[in-house]
Structures are given as C-alpha cells and as structure tokens.
C-alpha cells in the first residue's frame, strides 16, 4: 500500500539506509580497536635486550664468584670448591718441608696479576691474606720445635722446598681443610717449561715419604705413583734413605713417638 502523501520512489531510496549505517558502524568499531600488529615477535624484540643484559650480568657474577674472586684465607674456601676447583697463586713463605703459604691470584697474569695488580711482598701486607697449604700425600722430616730435636734431612727438605717454590706461581688442586686449618692439596709448579708435582719431586729425592696415616690421607689419585717413586729412592739410598736401615725413622714414627712421650709426661 502506498502512503497517500508519499511516493514510492522515496521509500525505495530509504530501504538500503539502515543496512548501510550498520555496516559503517561495524567498520568504525573495528577500526577503533586498531589494526593488528603485522609482526608477532615485536614484543619479544623489545624485551630481548633487557633479558640479554640481565643474563649477561648474572653470568658475569657467577664467573667472578667461582673463578675470579680472590680467596684471602683457608676459612674462605667454599666447601663445594674442594675436589672441584684448583687455586692459582704466588708462594710467599715456606714453613717446613711439606707446607707453605701462598697468595691467591685468580686468573693469573691474564687478569693483570704481576703487572697491573701487584702481589704483596712484605709480611705486614700479607698478614691475614694468604692461604696455608699442606702438600698432599707426602710427609717431610720434622724440624726442631717445642723442645723436640729435628729429624735427619729436615733442614735439607726445607731448603729444597724453599728454593723450588718460594716466590713462584703454583697451582693447588685442593681436597679439604685439615685439623690445623690448612688446605690439603696436590701442588704443581712450572720449572723449565715443565709442570712438576712438588710432592712427587720431594719423594724422588728422598726428602719426604709417602703419607702413612691410616685414615684421612689424600693422594689425588697418585698413591701408586708416589709409592713407586719412594721405592726407587730407597733403592738408590737417596736423602732420608742414605743411612742405616735399622736407624731409619719415618716422620710418622717420629710424631707417634713424641706424641706418646708428651702424653706420658702430662699424665
């Protein structure tokens, strides 16, 4: 039915307007949301530098804590370092035939020790800043102390060790702390381009025996090598083995004898 005051043509012209307005509304609403990002990794790219910087920082801290942090004394050696880490440093003093002190220089010359970073030399500078090392697997003749006489070749062992390692860089493969708060370690030093096991060299010269304690001895897997070297030095009558066999007293026997003597005097 045609409205009497209208025209058919005007009605036809308005028929498509509601649909056209709906389409425009839909288009304008989707446009208001913004167009989708064409790069799905854009956010990751923005965060990547921050994450990378953080990871690099953590790695640097771990590197410093495990390999470049200087250890000023035996008490500061972490338990997880024993049997897992070696320590590099300069020998600053030799106490007797089988122990010494050294100044830890992590990284060595590669990070400036000896040319950019000075290794202290005076006793005052070194006080409280060195690590006492007990050479693993060997026992040198006992020197005179606390009223006890020195064993034969005690002075020779001390002189040899002093000349061999004092003021030299050594690498210590550490195993544990002993009852005297020394770090027990197999020690290597470079001599004429060759890396030498200090304890083994002492045994070869008859300046130490293999460690004879029934428990707690550390050899770093070198026990058989040390025992063979000792047998050879004994056959060739070197150092401690040069005297009469009936008069020989090992460092362990010497210490056991004097411990019993002290105990009887105190009781």
Curated annotation (Swiss-Prot):
Residues 1-11 have a biased composition (Polar residues). The keyword Calcium applies. Residues 85-243 form the TNase-like domain. Residues 12-23 have a biased composition (Basic and acidic residues). It is an enzyme of class 3 (hydrolase). It is found in: Mitochondrion; Membrane. Keywords: Calcium, Endonuclease, Hydrolase, Membrane, Metal-binding, Mitochondrion, Nuclease, Transmembrane, Transmembrane helix. Its EC number is 3.1.-.-. GO terms for cellular component: membrane; mitochondrion. Residues 1-31 are annotated as: Disordered. PANTHER family: EBNA2 BINDING PROTEIN P100 (PTHR12302), SERINE_THREONINE-PROTEIN KINASE 31 (PTHR12302:SF3). This is Probable endonuclease LCL3.
């Amino acid at each position: 039915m045609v409205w009497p005051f209208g025209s058919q043509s005007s009605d036809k012209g308005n028929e498509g307007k509601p649909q056209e307005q709906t389409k425009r509304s839909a288009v304008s609403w989707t446009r208001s949301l913004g167009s989708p990002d064409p790069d799905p990794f854009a956010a990751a790219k923005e965060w990547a530098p921050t994450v990378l910087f953080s990871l690099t920082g953590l790695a640097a801290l771990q590197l410093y804590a495990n390999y470049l942090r200087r250890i000023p004394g035996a008490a500061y050696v972490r338990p997880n370092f024993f049997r897992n880490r070696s320590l590099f440093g300069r020998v600053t003093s030799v106490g007797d035939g089988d122990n010494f002190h050294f100044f830890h220089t992590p990284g060595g010359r590669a990070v400036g020790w000896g040319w950019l970073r000075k290794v202290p030399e005076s006793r005052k500078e070194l006080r409280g800043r060195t690590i006492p090392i007990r050479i693993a697997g060997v026992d040198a003749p006992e020197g005179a102390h606390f009223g006890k006489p020195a064993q034969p070749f005690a002075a020779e062992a001390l002189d040899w060790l002093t000349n061999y390692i004092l003021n030299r860089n050594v690498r210590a493969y550490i195993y544990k702390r002993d009852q005297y708060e020394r770090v027990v370690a197999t020690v290597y030093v470079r001599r004429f381009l060759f890396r030498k096991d200090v304890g083994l060299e002492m045994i070869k010269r008859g300046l130490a025996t293999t460690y004879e304690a029934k428990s707690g001895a550390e050899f770093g897997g070198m026990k058989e090598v040390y025992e063979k070297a000792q047998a050879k030095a004994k056959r060739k009558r070197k150092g401690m083995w040069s005297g009469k066999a009936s008069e020989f007293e090992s460092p362990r026997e010497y210490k056991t004898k004097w411990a019993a003597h002290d105990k009887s005097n105190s009781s």
